Amino acid sequence: MPSREIVEAFAKRLEDGDFVGAILDYYTPDAATYENLAEPVVGRDKLADKERGVLAAFKKVTAVRLGPSLIDGDVVASRWKFSFTHAEGATRTLEEVAWQTWRGNEIAEERFFYDPKQLGR
């Protein structure tokens, strides 16, 4: 079960823009993430590579947590607002809920729930 301090430190890394560092420091080596109902991406290194690709596709990416993270044993739920700015200057905003299963002080599984229409899909 993660402590409140660990969850807050993880959230701060995202809000500070250190998305790849947060993955490398807070996810288990065999972590899996799911985007809505898509097949998972498995493995911390693959997750970090995927995140690098997302960051390279945009001029700027920001994250703001909307309210506190809710912690119940090994489960943490957080509501996020991400903004993605393209090189041309257009910005798209995505609100999502991240549902995490922690193993000690590391994330073993994370599921992102959002409406893909927010991204023009």
Write out the residue ranges for each language-model feature.
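Hydrophobic beta-strand positions in extracellular immunoglobulin-like domains
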Residues: F82-F84, W102
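Solvent-exposed, amphipathic alpha-helical segments
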Residues: E5-R13
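A solvent-exposed, acidic/Ser-Thr-rich amphipathic alpha-helical stretch
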Residues: R4-I6, V20-D74
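Short, surface-exposed coil-to-beta transition loops
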Residues: T62-V64, R79, R92-A98
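A short hydrophobic beta-strand element
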Residues: G73-F82
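Short beta-strand edge/turn micro-motifs at domain boundaries
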Residues: E95-R121
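Short, cysteine-centered beta-strand-loop-beta hairpins and adjacent loop/turn segments enriched
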Residues: A56-K60, F84-T93
